[in-house]
């Protein structure tokens, strides 16, 4: 068995009396695409952020390629991980190229291949000279993905990265993310509230409820009825929407 790309070993995170993450153990194999789904407040984003140490566990540990993420400085760890979130946080005074290249620049690494990165996220190369204010929301998210890829990261953490986008742009970006995952041999963990998105993009779907993982199944297994009550309640939403649309 290969060493898991990410391993959660009995990870918990408490805020006072509240367990946001409650004793979770989970392996994410290399090149897997895992979606974390669940209702708001179920602990998805908190669990994700324990990987890049934006959240420190109250108990347990997280391993990246077999090494404890807490073993070294957090900034060094984050250079190995791509992270894209809903409000992508581009620097408004910098050009697109400068935003994309900031990680390697801070690390003292050679400049990334800007043309290749823009091609990967399907942005015109001329956009390198633009500033974030000149971009649409979808274009800014594409820049965010390029920035996450610039240091050569093989692990991508996506925290509701497409949540603020219109449905057409969201679908296009989701498809491109899955293509990049396959083309570049990435390991991807995606937090999403959209069950249809999870089923269409992921190779595994982990369902969270009250800080615990209550189901861990393939999309096909979930669609066939596996995973239990909480998982099937989420699967029922896109199914019901499809039935209602068919009846119009």
Regions found by a protein language model. Name each.
Residues 52:
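Helix-to-loop junction immediately C-terminal to a conserved catalytic motif
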Residues 111-126, 179:
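Conserved ABC ATPase "signature" region
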Residues 127, 148-149:
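ABC ATPase C-loop
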Residues 131-135, 139-141:
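Conserved ABC ATPase signature
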Residues 150-154:
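A short, proline-enriched helix->beta-strand linker immediately N-terminal to the Walker B motif
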Residues 210-211:
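Conserved ABC ATPase "signature" C-loop
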């Amino acid at each position: 068995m290969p060493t898991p790309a990410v391993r959660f070993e009995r990870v918990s995170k408490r805020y006072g009396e509240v367990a946001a993450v409650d004793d979770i153990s989970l392996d994410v194999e290399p090149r897997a695409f895992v979606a974390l789904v669940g209702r708001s407040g179920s602990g998805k984003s908190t669990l994700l952020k324990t990987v890049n140490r934006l959240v420190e566990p109250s108990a347990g540990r997280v391993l990246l390629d077999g090494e404890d993420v807490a073993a070294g400085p957090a900034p060094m760890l984050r250079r190995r991980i791509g992270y894209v979130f809903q409000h992508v946080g581009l620097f408004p005074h910098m050009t697109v190229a400068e935003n994309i290249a900031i990680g390697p620049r801070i690390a003292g690494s050679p400049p990334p291949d800007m043309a290749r990165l823009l091609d990967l996220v399907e942005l015109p190369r001329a956009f390198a000279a633009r500033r974030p204010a000149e971009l649409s929301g979808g274009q800014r998210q594409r820049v965010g993905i390029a920035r996450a890829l610039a240091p050569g990261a093989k692990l991508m953490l996506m925290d509701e990265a497409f949540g603020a986008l219109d449905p057409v742009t969201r679908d296009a970006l989701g498809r491109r993310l899955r293509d990049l995952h396959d083309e570049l041999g990435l390991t991807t963990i995606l937090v999403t509230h959209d069950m249809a998105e999870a089923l269409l993009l992921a190779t595994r779907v982990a369902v969270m409820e009250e800080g615990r993982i209550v189901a861990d199944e393939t999309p096909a297994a979930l669609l066939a009825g596996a995973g239990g009550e909480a998982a099937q309640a989420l699967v029922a939403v896109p199914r019901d929407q499809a039935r209602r649309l068919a009846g119009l």
